[in-house]
Amino acid sequence: FYNKPNSEFTYERRDASTAYIPEGEGRYYYAGGLSGGCTKAYLKLCTTICSWVDRDATNHIIPIWHDESLINKYFLDNPPAITLPPAYLYPEGWSLPFKPIILIRDKNKPEYGGHEFLRRKNSLWVKIKLICQKIKLAD
């Protein structure tokens, strides 16, 4: 969302979710793939988001981008001390006016194994785990 208006950000727009961000609010869109900080502040972020996940689960809501939606809501209410530039999560194949520092690989590319392989869906590893579970149940 580099150089885009916040109306194009894919924030959670359902007001029943703890991740809800109203139209017109928000200055940045934070990617969930890279985060960190001082211990106390980072643990506060983690415990807050954990409680929001529990609250949304109780209400049968999953934010549009899961934890990333919650991180955006958290940073809207608690602006971070430092916001890294987009070069730190530069999507592969994009043309942006700066050099990438951390490149996000396109998980759908076959040379990386594809999305299912990377998420271990329908992989040999999943099948082995299921067989092991069945063996334990049979004992």
Residue spans of the language-model regions?
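Conserved donor-nucleotide/metal-binding helix-loop-beta segment in metal-dependent transferases, i.e.
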Residues: 1-19
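Residue-level marker of intrinsically disordered, low-complexity segments enriched
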Residues: 19, 99-102, 133
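Catalytic core and acceptor-binding pocket of nucleotide-sugar-dependent glycosyltransferases
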Residues: 24-108
